[in-house]
Design a protein with these regions (language model features):
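Glycine/alanine-rich phosphate-binding loops at beta-alpha junctions
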Residues: 1-3
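Single, function-defining residue in the core of a domain
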Residues: 6-11, 22-24, 33-154
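Aromatic- and Gly/Pro-rich donor/ligand-binding loops
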Residues: 14
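Histidine-anchored nucleotide/phosphate-binding helix
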Residues: 29
Length: 154
């Protein structure tokens, strides 16, 4: 019921991993409303806090998809943990948009050239934003997507 009311605007979903019980980790998907993250779906596994397998992220997309009202516009905000190509593909198949911060250790291809993101980062000054429209990420060339590289101190 709440999601149906929130879905009149773009639904913003965020991902969070946290300790759950004794020796467990919960990977949670929240819907953001009025600056608060409201739990929507989660999967729990044994282990320590850290990166979860891509299959868990995909399971979370499938759980969330069943709860999202048909026709809702969804944007998922995530970190590098959910940037695997299978995970991105599952969100794309669900019709969701993706905003994901990823590490500079990867590769991208754009306009026929292969780029190491780390090298792009070295070449731009702090405060500069470089846009690569219709880029592809990883060796598998997942895309097209809009790749933004931001120069920062540190």
């Amino acid at each position: 019921m709440l999601l149906a009311h929130l879905a009149v605007q773009t639904l913003v979903l965020v991902i969070d991993g946290s300790v759950g019980g004794r020796g467990g980790v919960a990977l949670m998907r929240h819907v953001v409303d009025k600056g608060r993250a409201l739990p929507l779906a989660w999967v729990v596994r044994r282990g320590k806090k850290g990166q979860c397998p891509e299959a868990l992220h995909i399971a979370l997309v499938e759980q969330g998809q069943a709860l999202i009202p048909p026709g809702a516009r969804v944007v998922v905000l995530g970190e590098g943990e959910g940037d695997g190509t299978d995970c991105q593909h599952s969100r794309q198949e669900a019709g969701w948009f993706d905003v994901c911060r990823t590490g500079s250790h990867g590769t991208a291809s754009w306009d026929g050239a292969t780029l190491r993101l780390e090298t792009v980062g070295w070449c731009i000054t702090p405060g500069t934003l470089v846009e690569f429209p219709s880029a592809a990420l990883t060796r598998e060339a997942y895309g097209p997507l809009l790749l933004l590289c931001c120069g920062a101190n540190g």
